[in-house]
Amino acid sequence: MDNITSRPDPTAAFPNPNLPRLCFIKNVVKNPRIIIGDYTYYDDVDGADQFEKHVTHFYDFIGDKLIIGKFCAIAKGVEFVMNGANHRMDGVTAYPFYIMGGDWGSAIAPVKDELPLKGDTVVGNDVWIGQNVTVMPGVHIGDGAIIGANSVVASDIPPYAVAAGNPCRVIRKRFDDDFIDYLLAIKWWDWDIEKIEANFEALSSGDLSLIRKIKV
């Protein structure tokens, strides 16, 4: 596109004043362990700025992070379940007596190293996550992946896969392996915004030959 005179401000909470249901997540979250790339948005008619409430069981003493790349589209109701949701499972019961307080507060509480922690949850760049998806602790979703609505993502999803279901499984690849490798190499999401704007057609049309014509 030529002669662009206005573009969404990557530092704005709500980049389109006519679309208050959509926010750039990076500019509304407060927790420093939620790390979001530029232009990644959350779409929720009931309060897009409430994204952080959908990151659950996110406790400081565990220290895990939620990391989401650039240019991701996250639909209403997506929930990221973090490692604090996991109970110790090597005893007879997984019931956490100690959290009830009172005299039960002296029951054996697990230390961090005894919990089944899965590490940081990482979503790549250019990922589309459909409505009401649940992402479980420690999952890695690759660049360019698409996750179908109402899925429960409990294991890693490779780049440029279309995945859905409970548990979420890969349905198909979006492109052949050679083209996926090419896209992962050029990392279009890291281009400067002027270059992205100049190549909207190559990025968004169904003509995959156009992207290979761009000097990278």
What are these regions (language model features)?
Residues 1-33, 97:
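Extended, small-residue-rich solenoid/repeat segments and analogous flexible loops
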